[in-house]
Amino acid sequence: MDRSLTGPVKRSNAQAVAVPIGGCLIAIFSVLSYYLLLSNPGYFSHDELQWGARADVAHWRDLPWQAWTDFTAFQHRPLTFNLWLLITYAWFEQPALMHLLWVAMGLFNAALLFGCLKQLRATTLQSLGGAAAFAISPFAIYVHGWTATLADLLWLAAALALLQSVLRLPTESRWRAAFIALVFTSIGLLAKEAALAIAPLLLFAWLVSGRQPRLRAALMASGAVTAGYLWLRLPTLLYAPRPEGTYAWSLSMPLKRWAEMQLYPYLPTALEFASVSNASTTRFGLALLIAVVVAATFVIANRRIGATYLFGGAIAMGPPLVLAIGYPQYGYGYAALICGCGALAWPQLRARGQSVLLLALVLTSWHGYNIAREMHRIGAIQARYSPALADAVSAHRSRHSDTSTALRLALEVEADRGVFERLSRQISNYAGVAIGDQVKLVDRQQTHHAVIGADGSIRWAAGAE
């Protein structure tokens, strides 16, 4: 792209004061967030525990691999699933290593975004700012902190590597651009269906960048791979049986999903998208106001950057736009794109516009910290609860020959019911103990065998032992 994308730097006294203060706050939240992610002693949800059960085999050759050519599977993600099986087989019992790997992959994606911004002629400081804003965004913290998001890490890495590699080529270099696009689009689609967004994003990039030959060639190659993928997979994606609710789709959903993406970053206590709909009128209104002001700031700074923020951001969300339920990991690519827009728009903003972006960054970095803190809390609970649950199920089974008698557990803290439901859901086994449907969470007033403490420990009810 030409130099006009970044434009001349406009300095002000307000900037000289606001940038250091905002930067310090963002740095503090960043350090605290990644410390919490790296020191997390456990796991966030049932997904990791289910994969731990699948990978609990004697030898890695016995792992239940997904076939690379089974295009009838609802989730055809052989790159993700097979790599995840290997990682889980090796490190499931060492959560610290799992979290270290996820953070490393996440920061690698931030480094790829830095490289893309440099290729778009942003300064080193701008590029670093954009990459850092992405890494501390609530979307990224959610993905980097939950070790069930390998698919999101992989498809975005493929998309960013594609863009950076193509932008490094001479403008007229068509064949190399096409080959690069073919390879990385294929990698992305083998990782997650969200990579269907790569070709539309290349189309958008080609349109806003002066229709460069290298981007046109990349677009055609990526489009061909995407068309072939859809030819093989579209009937399955549209009509195959799927988990109830989670992957239901409707053409009435895109506006709602898009709105959630806009508002979620500015609701700093929200862990997942359900909190957007459940937010109070005041909090919802404030988030909406901030989102509108931020969007207007981009449009005023530069029309092309503003269009990329609004329309490119929607494209980056990809297929999840039509799903009935949204989750923060669906906004991972969106976060990379809008943070890149912020880096490119920064020098063209007046002091007021820069203050708006700084406020948004402080708010979103605080949000990211809150997510990291909650994930760390849940991880500490899981690290205690899962082994205790396996012991309790084993002890309960030894006293009840009738296997239809489920272990009934009450909660000490009812507010954490959702946490324990997720940590108990469809876990076939843990630490060699078969669990399956042998656990039932009940109200404290109902008959129960044991009580789950706030810290995840399990103590037997009076007379139950």
Where do the model's predicted regions map?
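Polytopic membrane enzymes that build or remodel cell-surface glycoconjugates and lipids
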Residues: 2-465
